[in-house]
Design a protein with these regions (language model features):
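Alpha-helical transmembrane segments of multi-pass membrane proteins
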Residues: 111, 143-155, 182-207, 233-241, ...
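Hydrophobic transmembrane alpha-helices of multi-pass small-molecule transporters
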Residues: 1-110, 227-229, 237-388, 485-490, ...
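Membrane-embedded alpha-helical segments and adjacent helix-loop junctions characteristic
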Residues: 20-21, 64, 78, 82-185, ...
């Protein structure tokens, strides 16, 4: 949620952007509350007995959760707790001890540690200094300036939530828009303002796919594959796929927005760099806290990439056998503990509990609920049954299925939470892949990548809602820019699968 204080700093009304962009759909929530159990019961009754009672119950619970997630009939994290309540009640062979471990899965601690690192960066304003430094380096050309904002936002959101990155960049962006109005004698350059706002929002979504901690769908995928298919994806391994996609798509999005959809009328922004440098000067010299967080940040990123590579080296692994037991989650928790230990001065440490408690605990519950649901898909044979039903698609070209999955998930995530969409569809997509005799990752990876590519509507993702609330972007303008990026995103996902994913994950497409 965007606080009133943050909006005040951004020059926005006191009403939160989520309220402005997404009014409380009380009627839709009530309909969803009733529709969920009805769909669950209908699905249970319609599915054949050959599936088994366990599979039919799991399908019903999945329908209930998907409906409540889509309509937000209950808060999304509360719906994520349903597996812990319903599976022990409805499945005699399943006890609470079988479901509860999903809420403490390895990947949840990876994200917890990543969140704490991000909170430490925000506490000491390191993320803001890094972003302003990047923007200050691009000059006063409007198109390049928008590119600088996009690079800065995209880089920050690799490590910090895309909502936080957008809120951080928005006040600076609004200040630059105000400067342009001043330079043009009170006349607004509508295209520049729109392109800058959309550039910030879109780069926040695009940059988040680069790392496992950048966006919840990535972490959900890691937990799902580890728990259900014994497939481990390392932090550095994912970056071999995520970073090329993010970099390429950032450039493409920048060109599309600034050259074709909303080309700025202003050719040069005198004073823009002075404004940004003034923001940097107001921050003062880099503090000891910022320096120490920067060191921890670099060590964390290096460890996530280097330790798995070192563990694969026979000479090194024989000399240091414990390296193989150091997972990405272990590194994340080590980083979190270090942040609480390292002193900045006699009174302060890099992270305190008052700051850490702001961690988005609801996202962690959502991870657990998604993993618990997907586990029952496998344990009850529902995934295998889905695979058998789509066996007729065995002769459909792989690229057609990748395309269809990407389009379907991308359209769904325009209307529902990308995390909830991912949690619902991962086991279904995996079942389809098995039915087509394809490696599970062939369809799971494009589904996860597409889940973070929502550009058309304010309700699609928090960054869109935040910039919509700025008053510089209308829904029509967002639709006009977003529809092109959505189309391009589908082909970017396909390109990434064939150019990088096959090589990085050892799958044949």
């Amino acid at each position: 949620m965007v606080t009133s204080e943050a909006r005040g700093k951004a020059g926005l009304p006191a009403l939160t952007t989520e309220q402005a962009a997404r009014p409380e759909p009380t009627r839709a929530k009530l309909i969803g509350l009733i529709l969920g159990p009805v769909l669950a019961l209908v699905l249970f009754l319609l599915l054949p007995d050959s599936l088994g009672t366990g599979g039919r119950i799991t399908a019903g619970v999945a329908a209930l959760m998907a409906t409540w997630w889509a309509t937000e009939a209950l808060p999304i994290p509360v719906t994520a707790l349903l597996p812990m309540l319903l599976f022990p009640m409805l499945l005699p062979e399943v006890g609470i001890a079988d479901v509860a471990p999903s809420y403490g899965a390895d990947v949840i601690f990876l994200f917890m540690g990543g969140f704490m690192l991000a909170l430490a960066m925000q506490k000491w304003n390191l993320h803001k200094r890094m972003a302003l430094a990047i923007v200050a380096s691009v000059g006063s050309n409007p198109v390049r300036l928008i590119g600088g904002f996009m690079v800065a936002t995209g880089f920050i959101t690799m490590w910090v939530s895309n909502t936080a990155a957008t809120i951080m960049m928005l006040p600076v962006g609004i200040s630059v828009v105000g400067l342009v109005i001043q330079l043009r004698g009170g006349k607004k350059d509508a295209n520049f303002a729109t392109a800058l706002m959309l550039g910030i929002a879109y780069s926040a979504s695009i940059g988040s796919v680069a790392t496992l901690i950048g966006t919840p769908p990535n972490a959900l995928m890691v937990g799902f594959l580890a728990e259900n298919h014994d497939i481990t994806i390392g932090f550095g391994q994912w970056m071999m796929v995520g970073v090329p996609l993010a970099l390429t798509f950032l450039v493409v999005a920048w060109v599309v927005i600034t050259r074709f959809v909303y080309p700025p009328a202003t050719k040069k922004l005198e004073g823009a760099q002075d404004l940004i440098r003034e923001e940097l000067r107001e921050m003062g010299p880099i503090s000891r806290g910022e320096k120490l967080v920067a060191v921890v940040f670099v060590l964390a990123a290096t460890s996530w990439i280097a330790i798995p590579l070192l563990a694969r080296n026979e000479t090194i692994s024989s000399a240091l056998p414990f390296l193989g037991d150091i997972s990405d989650s272990v590194i994340a928790i080590a980083v979190a503990v270090a942040l609480f230990l390292i002193p900045v001065d006699r009174q302060n440490r890099l992270l305190d509990w008052e700051t850490a408690v702001r961690l988005p605990w609801g996202i962690l519950l959502l991870f657990g609920g998604g993993i618990a649901l997907s586990k029952q898909f496998g344990d009850t044979g529902l995934s295998e049954w889905i695979g058998l039903q789509v066996g007729v698609l065995e002769n459909v070209p792989t690229w057609v299925m990748v395309l269809c999955i990407a389009v379907l998930v991308l359209l769904l995530t325009e209307l529902t939470s990308n995390t909830a969409t991912t949690a619902t569809f991962l086991p279904v997509v995996a079942g389809i892949a098995m039915g087509m005799d394809l490696p599970v990752m062939t369809l799971v990876v494009p589904a996860v990548l597409a889940a973070s590519m929502a550009f058309m509507l304010p309700v699609a993702t928090p960054p869109n809602a935040v910039v919509f609330g700025s008053g510089h972007v209308s829904i029509g303008q967002m639709l006009r820019g977003g529809v092109w990026l959505n189309i391009i995103a589908v082909f970017m996902v396909m390109f990434t699968m064939y150019a990088f994913a096959g090589w990085a994950f050892g799958i044949t497409l």
